[in-house]
């Protein structure tokens, strides 16, 4: 009898140990699962960050995958030159050479068919090269804040010689620069520093925002992207609204949301390279009339950082982790994401009582 009781006690103790072990393992496993939500207004660089995760943590894009982006590169290139041509008319600008008017008409006739086929015929490529070389077009490019133009426009158009070759295969950088509007939610999985990441890229345009809500539950951290270079631009979907003001409004609603009281907020002040180029000739007062500092990169970026961080209504209990980023620069993103991961590890272990 006594022997039976001791065997039962031993079995119960073993079961208890096993339950404790499983709970501990579950706790550690939970601490290693990271759900990241990428938020931000349209065209703030969220999808580029996702592509960088593939390049940095998943061996990048294979040759076959790169080939699949060829049609997107062609489309982005053609759409960019068309946007500049349309702006020439709106801004009442003249071409340097009158024959470019004819080229522009031919381009518009050929563009739709080429886009449907997903190619860039030699004749069309030559027309684009001639237009791009025109000083009128180049002048129109300097006034890009007055119309909607992809950030990658000059990147592709400057490299037409390479892009228009029959055997062209997009590089990793070409893929990074492609612009396709994100609709719905794009999920990416990868492992880094023994953590299992699930990253959700959510459509940034206003029409997409109602789809975000079910992503919110159990989020470890939010990476909020802001296009710093958009301080002098208006929204594609609302030409009355300054893009930076829209970003601030959205950040305010995310940062102070009751859903996110326990969530780490990481702020990526992105497109720092474009911002640095732009601030020298386009004053910050366009966006912030009260700004009295110099239009230099350091002072202007610090001012924008303060404007966003000041929106945090719970400064005593909630920290905003701010980084200046260039989403198309793999080394920069790698460095920043390394720092972000360390913050996540620390906060995650703390939440699970393991730190």
Swiss-Prot record:
A lipid is attached at residue 2 (N-myristoyl glycine). The keyword Transferase does not apply. GO terms for molecular function: G protein-coupled receptor binding; G-protein beta/gamma-subunit complex binding; GTP binding; GTPase activity; metal ion binding. Residues 266-273 are annotated as: G4 motif. Gene3D superfamilies: GI Alpha 1, domain 2-like, P-loop containing nucleotide triphosphate hydrolases. It is found in: Cytoplasm; Cytoplasm, Cytoskeleton, Microtubule organizing center, Centrosome; Cell membrane. Mg(2+) binds at residues 47, 182. Its main location: cytoplasm. PROSITE patterns: G_ALPHA. GO terms for cellular component: centrosome; cytoplasm; heterotrimeric G-protein complex; midbody; plasma membrane. InterPro entries: Gprotein_alpha_I, Gprotein_alpha_su, GproteinA_insert, P-loop_NTPase. GTP binds at residues 40-47, 176-182, 201-205, 270-273, 327. G proteins are composed of 3 units; alpha, beta and gamma. The alpha chain contains the guanine nucleotide binding site. PANTHER family: GTP-BINDING PROTEIN ALPHA SUBUNIT, GUANINE NUCLEOTIDE-BINDING PROTEIN G(I) SUBUNIT ALPHA-2. Guanine nucleotide-binding proteins (G proteins) are involved as modulators or transducers in various transmembrane signaling systems. The G(i) proteins are involved in hormonal regulation of adenylate cyclase: they inhibit the cyclase in response to beta-adrenergic stimuli. May play a role in cell division. Belongs to the G-alpha family. G(i/o/t/z) subfamily. This is Guanine nucleotide-binding protein G(i) subunit alpha-2. It comes from Oryzias latipes. The lineage of its organism: Eukaryota, Metazoa, Chordata, Craniata, Vertebrata.
């Amino acid at each position: 009898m006594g022997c039976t009781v001791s065997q039962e006690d031993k079995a119960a103790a073993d079961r208890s140990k096993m339950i404790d072990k499983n709970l501990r393992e579950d706790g550690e496993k939970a601490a290693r699962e990271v759900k990241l939500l990428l938020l931000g207004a349209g065209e703030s660089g969220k999808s580029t960050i996702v592509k960088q995760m593939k390049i940095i943590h998943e061996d990048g894009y294979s040759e076959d995958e790169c080939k699949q982006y060829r049609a997107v590169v062609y489309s982005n290139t053609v759409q960019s030159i068309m946007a500049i041509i349309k702006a020439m008319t709106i801004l009442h600008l003249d071409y340097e050479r009158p024959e470019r008017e004819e080229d522009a008409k031919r381009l518009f006739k050929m563009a739709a068919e080429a886009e449907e086929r997903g190619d860039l015929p030699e004749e069309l490529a030559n027309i684009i090269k001639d237009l791009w070389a025109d000083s009128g077009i180049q002048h129109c490019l300097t006034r890009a804040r007055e119309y909607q133009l992809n950030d990658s426009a000059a990147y592709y158009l400057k490299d037409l010689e390479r892009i228009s070759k029959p055997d062209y295969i997009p590089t990793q950088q070409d893929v990074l620069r492609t612009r396709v509007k994100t609709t719905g939610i794009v999920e990416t999985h990868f492992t880094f520093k023994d953590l299992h990441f699930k990253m959700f890229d959510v459509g940034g345009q206003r029409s997409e925002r109602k789809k975000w809500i079910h992503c919110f539950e159990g989020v470890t951290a939010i990476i909020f992207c802001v296009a710093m270079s958009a301080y002098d631009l208006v929204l594609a979907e609302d030409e009355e609204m300054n893009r930076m003001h829209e970003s601030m409004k959205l950040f305010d609603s995310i940062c102070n949301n009751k859903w996110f009281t326990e969530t780490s907020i990481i702020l990526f002040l992105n497109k720092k390279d474009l911002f640095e180029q732009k601030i020298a000739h386009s004053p910050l007062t366009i966006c912030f009339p009260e700004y009295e500092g110099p239009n230099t990169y350091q002072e202007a970026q610090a001012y924008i950082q303060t404007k966003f961080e000041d929106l945090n209504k719970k400064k005593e209990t909630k920290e905003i982790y701010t980084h200046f980023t260039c989403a198309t620069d793999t080394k920069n993103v790698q460095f920043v994401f390394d720092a972000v991961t360390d913050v996540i590890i620390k906060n995650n272990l703390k939440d699970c009582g393991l730190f």
